[in-house]
């Protein structure tokens, strides 16, 4: 059984290459595979391997004060979903190219999965404001599933979101907007940018879709959540669509 993890943390990294080298060394020692991006703004990890080795790696990373509060999201598969280990230094851990959306200057307010589930059941937030769920992912991902009634955008990459959102701004003015994505990293930057643009009633979904599945299940969500590895997508119980030879409905959305 393979333990799969997704985690990120925005934090000032003064020497990204040094951190990347340390991560690579310790992940290799534990025979982990996956993808890690390091930048001056933080770290973004998708790693998979033996459960004990995964626990040891994250114990090492959590011992660094910059990552002590980093949430790790877990799922399992019979097969290793990554072919190799890649650790790279990039300008951003998720490319957005907006100076007015830096998480190092402060986080956007968030909403917990259980609270969002309650709001969806009510049809409004706790103040009676209408609720709009904003999917910040690209069209390929959305095709596998999204929250019921979510506002989706015809984008192929995250950097296209600001322009694609412009026609909807007036309709969002009187609503409480909850931005969401796979694991939280894109919706965090999107929420910050929206606040910088004067859209004050914007929250990010804490932990993203995977955090929602992990905490409260799939209520209010239709379909699966696309992931960028050989599993292709996960259902609300975090089971992979494709898992080596064991892949019922493989390739189906």
Curated annotation (Swiss-Prot):
Keywords: Oxidoreductase, tRNA processing. It catalyses: uridine(34) in tRNA + AH2 + O2 = 5-hydroxyuridine(34) in tRNA + A + H2O. Residues 127-221 form the Rhodanese domain. GO terms for biological process: tRNA modification. It comes from the Bacteria. Its EC number is 1.14.-.-. The active site is at residue 181. Gene3D superfamilies: 3.30.70.100, Rhodanese-like domain (3.40.250.10). GO terms for molecular function: oxidoreductase activity, acting on paired donors, with incorporation or reduction of molecular oxygen. PANTHER family: RHODANESE-LIKE DOMAIN-CONTAINING PROTEIN 7-RELATED, THIOSULFATE SULFURTRANSFERASE/RHODANESE-LIKE DOMAIN-CONTAINING PROTEIN 2. Belongs to the TrhO family. Catalyzes oxygen-dependent 5-hydroxyuridine (ho5U) modification at position 34 in tRNAs. This is tRNA uridine(34) hydroxylase. The gene is trhO.
């Amino acid at each position: 059984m393979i333990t799969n993890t997704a985690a990120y943390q925005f934090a000032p990294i003064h020497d990204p290459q040094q951190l990347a080298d340390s991560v690579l060394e310790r992940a290799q020692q534990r025979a982990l595979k996956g993808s890690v991006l390091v930048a001056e703004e933080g770290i973004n990890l998708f790693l998979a391997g033996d459960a004990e080795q995964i626990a040891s790696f994250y114990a090492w990373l959590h011992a660094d004060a910059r990552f002590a509060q980093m949430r790790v999201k877990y799922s399992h598969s019979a097969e290793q979903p990554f072919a190799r280990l890649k650790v790279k230094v990039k300008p951003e851990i998720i490319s957005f190219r907006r100076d007015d959306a830096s998480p190092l200057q402060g986080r956007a307010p968030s909403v917990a999965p259980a609270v969002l589930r309650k709001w969806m059941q009510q049809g409004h937030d706790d103040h009676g404001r209408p609720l709009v769920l904003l999917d910040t992912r690209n069209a390929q991902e959305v095709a596998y599933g999204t929250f019921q009634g979510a506002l989706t955008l015809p984008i192929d990459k995250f950097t296209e979101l600001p322009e694609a959102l412009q026609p909807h701004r007036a309709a969002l003015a009187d609503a409480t907007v909850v931005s969401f994505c796979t694991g939280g990293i894109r919706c965090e930057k999107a929420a910050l940018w929206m606040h910088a643009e004067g859209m004050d009633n914007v929250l990010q979904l804490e932990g993203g879709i995977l955090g929602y599945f992990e905490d409260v299940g799939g209520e209010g969500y239709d379909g699966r959540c696309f992931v960028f590895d050989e599993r292709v997508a996960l259902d609300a119980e975090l089971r992979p669509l494709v898992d080596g030879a064991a892949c019922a409905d493989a390739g189906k959305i």
